[in-house]
Amino acid sequence: MNSPNESDGMSGREPSLEILPRTSLHSIPVTVEVKPVLPRAMPSSMGGGGGGSPSPVELRGALVGSVDPTLREQQLQQELLALKQQQQLQKQLLFAEFQKQHDHLTRQHEVQLQKHLKQQQEMLAAKQQQEMLAAKRQQELEQQRQREQQRQEELEKQRLEQQLLILRNKEKSKESAIASTEVKLRLQEFLLSKSKEPTPGGLNHSLPQHPKCWGAHHASLDQSSPPQSGPPGTPPSYKLPLPGPYDSRDDFPLRKTASEPNLKVRSRLKQKVAERRSSPLLRRKDGTVISTFKKRAVEITGAGPGASSVCNSAPGSGPSSPNSSHSTIAENGFTGSVPNIPTEMLPQHRALPLDSSPNQFSLYTSPSLPNISLGLQATVTVTNSHLTASPKLSTQQEAERQALQSLRQGGTLTGKFMSTSSIPGCLLGVALEGDGSPHGHASLLQHVLLLEQARQQSTLIAVPLHGQSPLVTGERVATSMRTVGKLPRHRPLSRTQSSPLPQSPQALQQLVMQQQHQQFLEKQKQQQLQLGKILTKTGELPRQPTTHPEETEEELTEQQEVLLGEGALTMPREGSTESESTQEDLEEEDEEDDGEEEEDCIQVKDEEGESGAEEGPDLEEPGAGYKKLFSDAQPLQPLQVYQAPLSLATVPHQALGRTQSSPAAPGGMKSPPDQPVKHLFTTGVVYDTFMLKHQCMCGNTHVHPEHAGRIQSIWSRLQETGLLSKCERIRGRKATLDEIQTVHSEYHTLLYGTSPLNRQKLDSKKLLGPISQKMYAVLPCGGIGVDSDTVWNEMHSSSAVRMAVGCLLELAFKVAAGELKNGFAIIRPPGHHAEESTAMGFCFFNSVAITAKLLQQKLNVGKVLIVDWDIHHGNGTQQAFYNDPSVLYISLHRYDNGNFFPGSGAPEEVGGGPGVGYNVNVAWTGGVDPPIGDVEYLTAFRTVVMPIAHEFSPDVVLVSAGFDAVEGHLSPLGGYSVTARCFGHLTRQLMTLAGGRVVLALEGGHDLTAICDASEACVSALLSVELQPLDEAVLQQKPNINAVATLEKVIEIQSKHWSCVQKFAAGLGRSLREAQAGETEEAETVSAMALLSVGAEQAQAAAAREHSPRPAEEPMEQEPAL
């Protein structure tokens, strides 16, 4: 009964019947075949004579008819039951077979897995064993290398010990050591300078070798300096010649007057150390050609035919002949070629008066220095032919070299060495003092022209950042000659214990000059006091420069001497001086130079000069943002020499004004009244190319989104569109460490605000410790960084981030002070992610937060509004002012419930302590489907930002202008579709606050086209240029559901602190056009209600006047007057 089609099923009451095929089902007999056997005893009913054989009886039909239907049904049921049982058995057999096969396959699979795992473990073990072997081999190689290195070191040490032993046991006739190349070069330079010392009698002003020509050694108050000696022809520093037929009775020691400023004790101690330095091979710090920086300056060698003798006028000598040009000494401290007299600058330089009469050019000398009016007549006069330009440039250069060399060696000049270069104003004071004789003028003018030539040559070749200043030229030349001549420098002579001066005409002349000089100092002091009062009244007193921690005490002393003693030509700008930036550049660009060498490189900048070599040619100083200290400086008249008799007793000394550093003005021009330079009241733009140096060492800008091309592209776009020409370009500077510490910790400031070469010097408290070099991670590109995207450049990043902060400070201070209308800072790296002690998200120092703090501290700005529309939340700015009620921080950023960088900025973060309610976060949620666009940002400004800002009423508005929400930025760094045009309109709305004092600072944004378009739109709005109108589709569009939900939540939270936003909750879903119409209708309704209320009040007042009874005390008209 096994059926091949056992899987078929049956429907109905007997499903098991389907197990059998239909053919078998039809073969089931309907009737039961019964083969009856008749009883044998039964006679045949039909027998008769049929032959006797019984015939079978046909009972089929009868039996069939007689079978019971019930029996048939039972039989069928039994058969069906049997079939069902057989089917169940078959099912059980099949299931048992399936289970058996499944178990078998499972066991096979487990065996295969175990085998595979065993193979993997064996392979892993083999790999680990190979790595262990490789590491072991590497370790063995390293150990072998170390052993080899140790052996080499031991061998080298043994060799050195052997050499030292040989040197110790050497004979006296042998050399003691083999000098290095540097020692050889310095020794050769020393020997050459010694060999070039002139022989006596070389020129007409040389001192004859006669024993009587050397005077006595005059002792000074400083008895610690030993007497100097030298070979023949080199006079000792304190032995003085008696020139010509001058009688030795008139020789008198020099006396120190009250007009000479005392030098700092520290400078004196350092000078004493320099004097005691005996070996010429040691490093000299008093020369200008020894230091690394000064090696770049021009070294003028070569001497004219017939070298002159060495300096014939030394301090302490009697009055010498005017024929020696080196004895021409001006009152302002220029000593010409006198190598043994340190220069000291008086606080005020002399300027030419407008009335150039001959009497006003009468010259006199300082009574503490040798006079030039005694002795023989000068053989050189100055004529117009001597001041004529040489036709050949090479001849003129050769003449200048010979002149300088001759002056270094103590000789004088002839007419052919004169130059036509204009004399700087700071040197004109030299020509106003000295002898009134024509020969005194000639000798003095030679010095002035020669010093100017040397300054110009050194300026053309020296490093641009540290150009030579006319105020320092005299000292540079003097120190240079001291280096070449190898004559020791000593301190200025002090008051001696000598007898009173003889009553000679020369002595009387010096007394008169001393009295006049004291009168001049008194007048000068009065002028300074009056000028200080004027500046204080007008509120334009310049700020004192804040010192950088990296400036040493010696550098500060040197700068004060330059600014006060020599008369600095410019006043420091806000919080910084040019000398500070120069000092920082020295530290960063030439780190091997020490502080003493950098002291000599202080630059006194011109007001019109560039900020440095790093600044592009199009960056110029648009005007002095902070007024000069001396407002009476005037253009100078050309220098003219008059031959006038000396009449010191009758000509009063005129107080001279401070001179400019520019050359003298052409003759005949009248000096216009000096007015303080003011900025145009327009938009200021600040940018500095030094910020371009902050980049990864790999140099691949495609890997790093925050690269230097961002600000370069924006600057180029503003130039191409002509917007830059309408703006005031502001010179940037580097922020000081003290300014940065207003927001950041000292540890963070030192770590990211200093370069590794000067970090240890500045870290006096040892805050960084030994781990300062281990704070950075190695990036996949090969560079280093704070994290995976915030790169760091050890050499340039510290200066670049400080420059970004300083640029924004300069711009914001000028806007807050009313010098500029508004401003846009093109700076990088950004800063709004930088927290107090954490650098992240391309940010190191929070420029906007530092600016807000300093505006409040230094300019007393009351309330500051910071609007941050960067797509990333400004977690650093929020942290800085979270508890400050004077700074309102409003941020519009993508939040996505904390799933977007940096994850902060929830709407519930409203501030803490007294600053509750002064932190507003418009945190967009819902992702980028649909993206947030113009409609949503404009709606947020209409309903949240501007109402709260107007109620806050800030004094200054700072904007963290990140443009990564502009369309074109992909989702990881953006994802929104705000147009660049929209940011222009947002800027225009912010300009209605704080009287228009709005400063935008570039933050994020990495698509160059997008940030250029947005920057152009913002600058156009700041300049009040007509903006492109928004599309009508934008005005008709309604904000999306996610934005409406975000704004509803923000209004719900902020309405507890700002009641002005509550009325906008109902109209968040309206389009801009509908909102404008509603606001217009509301305004008209309010106006109508106001008119109705006024009319009703007037009617009520009139009715009250009509019905009110007349007071009893008021008499009626008909009543007679009493």
Curated annotation (Swiss-Prot):
What does the function comment of this entry state?
Responsible for the deacetylation of lysine residues on the N-terminal part of the core histones (H2A, H2B, H3 and H4). Histone deacetylation gives a tag for epigenetic repression and plays an important role in transcriptional regulation, cell cycle progression and developmental events. Histone deacetylases act via the formation of large multiprotein complexes. Involved in muscle maturation by repressing transcription of myocyte enhancer MEF2C. During muscle differentiation, it shuttles into the cytoplasm, allowing the expression of myocyte enhancer factors.
The species is Homo sapiens (Human)
Question: What Pfam families does the record tag this protein with?
Answer: HDAC4_Gln, Hist_deacetyl
Q: Which InterPro entries match?
A: HDAC4/5/7/9, His_deacetylse, His_deacetylse_dom, His_deacetylse_dom_sf, Hist_deacetylase_Gln_rich_N, Ureohydrolase_dom_sf
Give me the gene this protein comes from: HDAC5
Where is the segment annotated Histone deacetylase? Answer: 684-1028
Covalent cross-link (Glycyl lysine isopeptide (Lys-Gly) (interchain with G-Cter in SUMO2)), residues: 35
Here the segments flagged for biased composition (Acidic residues) are 581-621
One Gene Ontology term of the biological-process aspect is: B cell differentiation
PANTHER family, per the entry: HISTONE DEACETYLASE, HISTONE DEACETYLASE 9-RELATED
User: What is the reported tissue distribution?
Assistant: Ubiquitous.
Modification after translation is described as: Phosphorylated by AMPK, CaMK1, SIK1 and PRKD1 at Ser-259 and Ser-498. The phosphorylation is required for the export to the cytoplasm and inhibition. Phosphorylated by the PKC kinases PKN1 and PKN2, impairing nuclear import. Phosphorylated by GRK5, leading to nuclear export of HDAC5 and allowing MEF2-mediated transcription. Ubiquitinated. Polyubiquitination however does not lead to its degradation.
Outcome of altering residue 292 to A?
Abolishes phosphorylation by PKC
Protein name, UniProt field: Histone deacetylase 5
Catalytic reactions of this protein: N(6)-acetyl-L-lysyl-[histone] + H2O = L-lysyl-[histone] + acetate
Provide this UniProt record's keywords sorted from A to Z.
Answer: Acetylation, Chromatin regulator, Cytoplasm, Hydrolase, Isopeptide bond, Metal-binding, Nucleus, Phosphoprotein, Repressor, Transcription, Transcription regulation, Ubl conjugation, Zinc
The entry's active site is 833
Q: Where is the signal peptide?
A: none
Q: Anything noted about its domains?
A: The nuclear export sequence mediates the shuttling between the nucleus and the cytoplasm.
Q: Where is the composition biased (Basic and acidic residues)?
A: 247-258, 272-281, 1104-1113
